[in-house]
């Protein structure tokens, strides 16, 4: 759950700083200690 929380904050940080970018672009550019699969899953959940 800790990992999920960190993942969520990373994604939110990226969304905050890449508002004009497409979600998939954010996904690619913001992989920082988080697996692509987890970011992809996060996008599916939101």
From Swiss-Prot:
* Protein name per the record: Putative uncharacterized protein DDB_G0280641
Taxonomic classification, please?
Answer: Eukaryota, Amoebozoa, Evosea, Eumycetozoa, Dictyostelia
């Amino acid at each position: 759950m800790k990992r999920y929380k960190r993942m969520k904050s990373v994604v939110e940080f990226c969304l905050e700083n890449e508002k004009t970018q497409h979600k998939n672009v954010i996904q690619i550019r913001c992989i920082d200690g988080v697996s692509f699969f987890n970011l992809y899953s996060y996008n599916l959940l939101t």
